[in-house]
Amino acid sequence: MARVKRALNAQKKRRTVLKASKGYRGQRSRLYRKAKEQQLHSLTYAYRDRKARKGDFRKLWITRINAAARLNGITYNRLIQGLKAAGVEVDRKNLAEIAVSDAAAFAALAEVAKAALPADVNAPSGEAA
């Protein structure tokens, strides 16, 4: 028989892969080759979704800001344009938090944004000009 020089290392490697694949369905948690393939895919998905999470949160913040802005009679893009024109530097994360937790403060910010916009921008569509 051939001599196996790396038996302990191979066993340890297989054991760590199978330990990491605990909780996968079927053969993917029991067979080394399937577990190794699934682990590679899982790590790829985790990397991809860590990047995607940032965009997902930004979408959520924008949705919340838009909903609160419309309650105050202004759209999201006009709110952001007005805040920039007024020199108010609040990022979307904090603006969404204010919109959810403190409606009065958000209403005040909406009024500041409305005041900073040109007069014809505040008119409903169809009446401008």
Swiss-Prot record:
Pfam families attached here? Ribosomal_L20 (PF00453)
What does the record give under GO molecular function?
A: rRNA binding; structural constituent of ribosome
Q: Which InterPro entries match?
A: Ribosomal_bL20, RIBOSOMAL_L20_CS, Ribosomal_protein_bL20_C
* Ribosomal protein keyword on record: yes
An example of a Gene Ontology BP annotation on this entry? translation
Query: Membrane spanning segments where?
Result: none
Sorted keywords for this record are: Ribonucleoprotein, Ribosomal protein, RNA-binding, rRNA-binding
Signal peptide (residue range): none
Q: Cite the CDD domains for this sequence.
A: Ribosomal_L20
- Name the GO cellular-component terms: ribonucleoprotein complex; ribosome
Q: Function of this protein?
A: Binds directly to 23S ribosomal RNA and is necessary for the in vitro assembly process of the 50S ribosomal subunit. It is not involved in the protein synthesizing functions of that subunit.
Which protein family is it in?
A: Belongs to the bacterial ribosomal protein bL20 family.
Instruction: Please state what the protein is called.
Output: Large ribosomal subunit protein bL20
The organism encoding this protein is: Mycolicibacterium gilvum (strain PYR-GCK) (Mycobacterium gilvum (strain PYR-GCK))
